[in-house]
From Swiss-Prot:
GO MF annotation terms: mRNA binding; structural constituent of ribosome
The encoding gene: rplL
Disulfide bonds: none
Function per UniProt: Forms part of the ribosomal stalk which helps the ribosome interact with GTP-bound translation factors. Is thus essential for accurate translation.
Full protein name: Large ribosomal subunit protein bL12
Cellular component GO terms held in the UniProt record: cytosolic large ribosomal subunit
Keyword Coiled coil among UniProt keywords: no
Keyword annotations of the record: Ribonucleoprotein, Ribosomal protein
Organism: Anoxybacillus flavithermus (strain DSM 21510 / WK1)
UniProt key word Ribonucleoprotein: yes
Length: 121
């Protein structure tokens, strides 16, 4: 029996006969005709869950205009003048920890505008 003859025989079968054929093939060869489950959806959800939600803003270098940077650090953190100066003078130091990505980007932009070098981790 050729492949074409098998296809013709299957074309002429009723739905009930096809169902019986599938069951017989599953039993004979130890396979299943069930559609494979797509695992990629679960993997994507896992990757999204692992995405970082809290970021630390690290002042890497106070830059040449430290007075401007100290003012911005005070504005962002509420630190006193001495504490802000110590933070800027002793880099690298975290300015803010555990903030959202948006807030971290805003803080980075303000500090870089004042002349500092900033990292987000």
């Amino acid at each position: 029996m050729t492949k074409e003859q098998i296809i013709e025989a299957v074309k002429n079968m009723t739905v009930l006969e096809l169902n019986d054929l599938v069951k017989a093939i599953e039993e004979e060869f130890g396979v299943t005709a069930a559609a494979p489950v797509v695992v990629a959806g679960g993997a994507a959800a896992g990757a999204a869950a692992e995405e970082k939600t809290e970021f630390d803003v690290i002042l890497a270098d106070g830059g040449a205009q430290k007075i401007k940077v100290i003012k911005v650090v005070r504005e962002l953190t509420g630190l006193g003048l001495k504490e802000a100066k110590d933070l800027v003078d002793n880099t690298p130091k975290p300015v803010k920890e555990g903030v959202s990505k948006e807030e971290a980007e805003e803080i980075k932009a303000k500090l870089e505008e004042a002349g500092a070098k900033v990292e987000i981790k």
